[in-house]
């Protein structure tokens, strides 16, 4: 079901913010860690047999890759005496080993061995684990407040299924820790009007479509490139009216696609909450190859577009790091509808203190709802 917000009002002159947000506005959830798949590492940063310490969702985590190559994500603390497995922990075969007393733990969090005990292991002891997977060179972890299983899977990216595009990794990787709630990053999809001011575009951008459905947000923005100039490196044949497509999957994964009239490109971003204040912003992009180029390093216009976009992304940081969330913002008629739709959609990813039969994505017994699996 696609969520829509009526544009009708008994008083056509009513303030758009009042009409779309209501008298109370739309609050930001007091629980800061939304449901969804989140990037917790680049795959290349975790070799076979390696252990990596991490801190996400307000928790200390440990990532490890077994000798067979399987990735696991779990809470960091050994359930023997509380040692941090991410500090000095090692991998033996398919298990992670505590550096303090050598207790071994399987990837599913169960105790595999107490090396000095006649009981062998404690079958009733378990470390909390996070569902994890590798997706186009990223390690993803599923976060859900109550530990419920994933109800959707990350999308297939057609651009990365062939050799027509340069690889996402490693030459386009960028990671920044930003003082911002991940939802504020997603709100860029409802805000084409900042492009002219923050990113110094010569002409304003406008939204041509905006919809939210299930765990998926899809928006199309019309933007003008090369205005007032006969030719630029990005628009060698003159100004271009380009259609930029935004897709967000829950609040953790984002895609931005640029058309071939510029440089055909797919950007892949991850907004992963570290704690109450900070978010790790993962960024990569893949552009169509330059004619005849079979290498992995972007060249020509693809390389220039990568450098440009990496700088453009950083231009948003100063606003995010210094802003205040307004529950009832004062918006122009052109922007109120989409902002309100996005914020209402985002609320479904913040379950309450206890599981509820009304929680999006789950049945009354807490199982993933098949109806919610559709993008």
Where are these regions (language model features)?
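Rieske [2Fe-2S] iron-sulfur-binding domain
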Residues: 2-11, 16-18, 25-28, 39-162, ...
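Charged, low-complexity, helix/coiled-coil-prone segments
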Residues: 17-22, 40-42, 120-136, 243-264, ...
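Short charge-dense sequence patches
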Residues: 3, 7, 23-27, 131-141, ...
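C-terminal catalytic domain of Rieske-type non-heme iron oxygenases
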Residues: 70, 151-375
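Short, charged N-terminal helix-start/capping segments
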Residues: 1-5, 9-12, 17-30, 199, ...
């Amino acid at each position: 079901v696609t969520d829509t917000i009526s544009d009708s009002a008994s008083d056509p002159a009513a303030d758009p913010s009042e009409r779309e947000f209501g008298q109370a506005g739309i609050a930001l959830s007091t629980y800061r860690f939304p449901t969804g798949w989140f990037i917790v590492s680049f795959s290349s940063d975790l070799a076979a047999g390696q252990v990596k310490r991490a801190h996400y969702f307000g928790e200390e985590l440990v990532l490890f890759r077994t000798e067979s190559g399987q990735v696991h994500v779990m809470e960091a603390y050994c359930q023997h005496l509380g040692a941090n497995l991410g500090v000095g922990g090692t991998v033996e075969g398919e298990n992670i080993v505590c550096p303090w007393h050598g207790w071994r733990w399987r990837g599913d969090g169960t105790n595999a061995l107490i090396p000095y005990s006649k009981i062998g292991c404690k079958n009733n002891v378990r470390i909390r684990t996070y569902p994890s997977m590798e997706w186009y060179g990223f390690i993803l972890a599923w976060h859900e407040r109550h530990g419920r299983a994933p109800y959707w899977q990350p999308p297939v990216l057609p651009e990365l299924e062939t050799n027509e595009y340069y690889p996402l990794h490693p030459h386009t990787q960028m990671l920044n820790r930003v003082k911002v709630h991940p939802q504020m990053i997603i709100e860029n999809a409802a805000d084409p009007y900042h492009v002219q001011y923050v990113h110094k575009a010569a002409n304003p951008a406008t939204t041509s479509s905006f919809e939210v459905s299930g765990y998926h947000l899809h928006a199309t923005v019309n933007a003008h490139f090369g205005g007032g100039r006969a030719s630029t490196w990005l628009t060698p044949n003159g100004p271009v009216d380009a259609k930029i497509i935004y897709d967000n999957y829950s609040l953790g994964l984002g895609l931005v696609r640029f058309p071939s009239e510029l440089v055909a490109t797919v950007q892949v971003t991850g907004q992963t909450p570290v704690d109450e204040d900070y978010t790790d912003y993962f960024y990569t992009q893949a552009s169509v190859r330059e004619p005849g180029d079979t290498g992995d390093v972007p060249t020509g216009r693809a390389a220039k577009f990568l450098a440009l976009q990496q700088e453009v992304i950083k231009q948003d940081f100063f606003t995010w790091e210094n802003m205040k969330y307004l529950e009832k913002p004062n918006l122009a008629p052109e922007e109120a509808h989409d902002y309100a739709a996005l914020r209402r959609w985002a609320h479904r990813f913040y379950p309450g203190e206890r599981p509820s039969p009304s929680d999006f994505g789950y049945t009354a017994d807490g199982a993933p709802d098949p109806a919610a699996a559709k993008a």
